């Protein structure tokens, strides 16, 4: 990696971009929003998987009651921010139309981190898989978590 390969920009939060990287990304519902309904979680999981293998490689994802975590690698010339924008925009419009939610649905910003090595990649995938158990320890099966079978960065 050279300095010219790494792009850093800032909105309210800093964002680092490095071509070919895997990112761990988190975004949340806006503060005025009630928890996601089961149908909304289904829609969001479907949206996350929709362009998998075309615009991005999705390694893991979980839709919680008020936030989302994904482990994702943009493909080709797809910018990470465009991928996240498409997920948030598509689901916000769908949630407004189908569930009567009023905007804003999602917080404007999101947290992203470049995954630096294979161990961190595996740790983040495990975090995604275990995230529902942190909130609901008695849970045996959570339908809104997904981890790719061939989990290699």
Give, region by region, the residue ranges found by the protein language model:
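Short catalytic/metal-binding and nucleic-acid-binding patches
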Residues: 1-153
């Amino acid at each position: 990696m050279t300095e010219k390969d790494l792009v850093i920009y800032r909105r309210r939060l800093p964002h680092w971009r490095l071509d070919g990287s895997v990112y761990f990304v988190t975004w949340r519902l806006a503060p005025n929003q009630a928890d996601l309904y089961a149908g909304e979680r289904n829609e969001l999981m479907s949206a996350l998987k929709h362009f998998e293998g075309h615009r991005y490689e999705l390694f893991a994802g979980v839709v919680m009651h008020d936030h989302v975590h994904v482990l994702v690698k943009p493909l080709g010339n797809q910018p990470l921010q465009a991928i996240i924008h498409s997920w948030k925009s598509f689901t916000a419009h769908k949630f407004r139309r189908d569930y009567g939610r009023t905007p804003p649905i999602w917080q404007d910003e999101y947290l992203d981190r470049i995954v630096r090595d294979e161990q961190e990649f595996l740790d983040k995938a495990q975090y995604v898989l275990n995230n529902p158990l942190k909130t609901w320890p008695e849970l045996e099966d959570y339908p809104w978590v997904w981890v790719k079978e061939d989990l290699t960065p």
